[in-house]
From Swiss-Prot:
Protein name as it appears in the record: Alpha carbonic anhydrase 4
Active site: H99 (proton acceptor)
Gene for this chain: ACA4
Gene3D superfamilies: Alpha carbonic anhydrase (3.10.200.10)
Superkingdom assignment: Eukaryota
Keyword Ligase in record: no
First-level EC class: lyase
Protein's job: Reversible hydration of carbon dioxide.
């Protein structure tokens, strides 16, 4: 398939997922007091999520589940960037959802736009280690920036991290992470632009939420550049969640032949 055909195919896929409610994000991620675990080969572990609750059936039966391995063998190169981001500071709170730590914006924190559809930034949270892998490599942390459209669609940006220098955005949140406990803490104005990607290269594919109910139809954008995070910051996130969720990454799912697009404006 040549470049123009790939671009047309991707646009068609996006149109399908942006236009029809029955494929859209119908259910939010579970909140606190979650009855699932990340312990593999257990009754409530990832392999059994679809059996815990009938509304979670797609966790086991879906064809577009996330995360996946972003392997070079599956990637198609696309030159059309097909998105813009316009973020701004807004009031935010930090919450321990039991299985992860979430920062949610209570005001207008801006948006990203994919194929003329606006997705408003709602919240971000972290998974340790990373959920997506790149050519089989799993990194130390993954940030998810969750966006929703006026029609209830979901688009998520994934940012990968490896051990190294402290992450500036997390440094500003560290006191809140350490103090959150079981209560919601006001963070004041938080600027999502401080989640710096430092690249215009990214992967994109159609997938799902990575926690129950595993709803499909999510547009995933995974940033190519791997940022750095300190061990202190990872430890703070792991100590803040409930016992048993110190590592909170869903195993890589079968891609089932899905296409993955890679955007590189320099090629």
């Amino acid at each position: 398939m040549d470049t123009n055909a790939k671009t047309i195919f991707f646009m068609a896929m996006c149109f399908i997922y942006l236009s029809f409610p029955n494929i859209s994000h119908a259910h939010s991620e579970v909140d606190d007091e979650t009855p699932f675990t990340y312990e593999q080969k257990t009754e409530k572990g990832p392999e059994g999520w679809g059996k815990i609750n009938p509304h979670w059936k797609v966790c086991n039966t879906g064809r577009y589940q996330s995360p996946i391995d972003l392997t070079n063998e599956r990637v198609s190169l696309i030159h059309d960037q097909a998105w813009t981001r316009q973020y701004k500071p807004a009031p935010a709170v930090i919450t321990n959802r039991g299985h992860d730590i979430m920062v949610s914006w209570k005001g207008d924190a801006g948006k990203m736009t994919i194929r003329k559809t606006d997705f408003n930034l709602v919240q971000c949270h972290w998974h340790s280690p990373s959920e997506h892998t790149v050519n089989g490599t799993r990194y130390d942390l993954e940030l998810h920036m969750v966006h929703t459209s006026a029609r209830g669609r979901t688009a998520v940006i994934g940012v990968l991290y490896k051990l190294g220098e402290p992450n500036e955005f997390l440094t500003k949140l560290l006191n809140g992470i350490k103090a959150v406990g079981n209560k919601e803490i006001n963070l004041g104005m938080i600027d999502p632009r401080e989640i710096r990607f430092q690249t215009r290269k990214f992967y994109r594919y159609i997938g799902s939420l990575t926690v129950p109910p595993c709803t499909e139809g999510v547009i995933w954008t995974v940033v190519k550049r791997v940022n750095t995070i300190s061990m202190e910051q990872i430890t703070a996130l792991r100590q803040a969640v409930d016992d048993g969720f110190e590592t909170n990454s869903r195993p890589v799912q079968d891609s089932k032949g899905r296409s993955v697009w890679f955007y590189d404006p320099n090629v």
